[in-house]
Design a protein with these regions (language model features):
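Conserved class I S-adenosyl-L-methionine
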Residues: 1-39, 147
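Short alpha-helix
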Residues: 160-181
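A short, conserved alpha-helix within the catalytic core of class I
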Residues: 116-129
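Short "lid" loop at the C-terminus of a central beta-strand within the Rossmann-like core
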Residues: 116, 143-149, 184-185
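Conserved beta-strand signature within the Rossmann-like core of class I S-adenosyl-L-methionine
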Residues: 136-143
Length: 207
């Protein structure tokens, strides 16, 4: 899918939700469960952040947050959410696959359901996430596993875009894996992520 096709695809989805938030306004639960990692003043990057739910929550914790998002429709809603919550986020209209990732700039890199990337693109995206992280910093990643195709409660339909523990262990083998778990849970994240889901969560520290 081209950059413009992807932008139109996601903008149409966010626009169709109307005043509602497609993925809700509450932070992702796996990210929330890692709150012990967060310190005020840390620099955080939230990739393909959508309508701002995760970036805004991080900013509420006192972090200095940059959030990338491909869809201008989603960014407008994200800015509205940040204003309503009284926080500031540096929202960047950018394709996560093409954004210029600064070297060793962030203490925390967050990727929540960023499974739009095909395998070749995913490898490059993961390398950029690793490179932009400061030594000692952490990547927090949440995605769906292939079993999610049995449930159909969210996520991509292409099995090659889904994560397994083996895939992430290989991709982040040069990091310290503080958490890597496949599990099933009920999701209630806005209109798009609802119901029983097959999930994987990872926390990887740059050493």
């Amino acid at each position: 899918m081209s950059h413009h096709d992807a932008q139109d695809f996601w903008s149409d989805k966010y626009r169709a939700a109307g005043q509602a938030y497609l993925f809700g306004t509450a932070p992702n639960r796996f990210l929330q469960s890692q709150s012990a990692l967060l310190l005020p003043g840390q620099r955080a990057l939230s990739i393909a952040d959508g309508e701002g739910r995760n970036a805004v929550w991080l900013a509420e914790r006192g972090l200095d947050v940059t959030a990338t998002e491909l869809s201008p429709v989603a960014l407008d809603k994200a800015a509205t959410l940040a204003a309503a919550r009284g926080v500031s986020v540096d929202f960047a209209l950018a394709d996560a696959l093409r954004w210029t990732y600064p070297d060793e700039a962030f203490d925390l890199v967050v990727g929540i359901f960023i499974q739009f990337a095909a395998p070749d693109e995913r490898r490059a995206l993961f390398e950029n996430m690793k490179r932009t992280l400061k030594p000692g910093g952490c990547i927090v990643l949440q995605g769906y596993t292939p079993k999610q195709l049995d449930y159909g409660t969210g996520g991509p339909s292409a099995v090659e875009n889904l994560y397994t523990a083996a895939l992430l262990r290989d991709a982040f083998g040069d990091f310290e894996l503080e958490c890597l778990q496949e599990y099933e849970s009920e999701l209630d994240e806005g209109l798009a992520h609802r119901g029983h889901s097959a999930l994987i969560g990872m926390v990887a520290r740059k050493v």
